[in-house]
Curated annotation (Swiss-Prot):
Disulfide bonds: none annotated. One of its GO terms (molecular function) is RNA binding. This is Capsid protein. It is found in: Virion. The modification N-acetylserine is found at residue 2. Pfam families: Ilar_coat (PF01787). One of its GO terms (cellular component) is ribonucleoprotein complex.
Length: 218
């Protein structure tokens, strides 16, 4: 056995500094796994939260398309979970803020009428509780919002009270470019604002209930 073989054999299993540097360089060049998209703690491109309010991001981006060119009608729901004892539901104010990106800039309008045929607000709860004070607002800065007040239950005390609220909104198309494909909407962010309330549990994740495409579905 030559002296070079003995020398190499004597260092078997012990990495050299050169091999360590090479391994580190090779590891750095390996493709990294995709980063997880975690919702941020406060709105980024929406309006800023007001004092005394809690903002929460609900869900991931959602894309909707119109198949008949009449518009898109869709329904969102979220669960309000109160876990603390002796919590009053009255005077809770919710605001849903949608940040949207249309497929064709300037080709959509927000309907002024978001009520049913008999004049009731389309925001309702379970079991089908009405929100007569619901107000719909369009804002060019971030999209549109629906503001409503939860119904007052005359001093009712909720213990482990769980309530699911659904909000139905309607978008109509306006001045769609000739020859364009079916327009679509991408909802970048959905935020819910509620008044800070003692011992109130967090709002659960956003649930997509359904997509309505017929004009008389709502």
């Amino acid at each position: 056995m030559s002296s070079s073989q003995k020398k190499a054999g004597g260092k078997a299993g012990k990495p050299t500094k050169r091999s360590q540097n090479y391994a580190a360089l090779r590891k750095a060049q390996l493709p990294k796994p995709p980063a997880l998209k975690v919702p941020v703690a406060k709105p980024t491109n929406t309006i800023l939260p007001q004092t005394g309010c809690v903002w929460q991001s609900l869900g991931t981006p959602l894309s909707l398309s119109s198949f008949n060119g009449l518009g898109v009608r869709f329904l969102y729901s979220f669960l309000k979970d109160f876990t603390g004892p002796r919590i009053l539901e009255e005077d809770l104010i919710y605001r849903m803020v949608f940040s949207i990106t249309p497929s064709h800039a300037g080709t959509f309008c927000l309907t002024d009428d978001v009520t049913t045929e008999d004049g009731r607000a389309v925001a309702h709860g379970n079991p089908m509780q009405e929100f007569p004070h619901g107000a719909f607002h369009a804002n060019e800065k971030f999209g549109f919002e629906l503001v409503f007040t939860a119904p007052t239950h005359a001093g009712m005390q909720n213990q482990n009270f769980k309530h699911s609220y659904a909000v139905a909104l309607c978008l109509d198309f306006d001045a769609q470019p000739e020859g364009s494909k079916n327009p679509s909407y991408r909802f970048n962010e959905v935020w819910v604002e509620r008044k800070a309330f003692p011992r109130a549990g967090p709002l659960r994740s956003l649930i997509t209930v359904g997509l309505l495409d017929e004009a008389d579905d709502l």
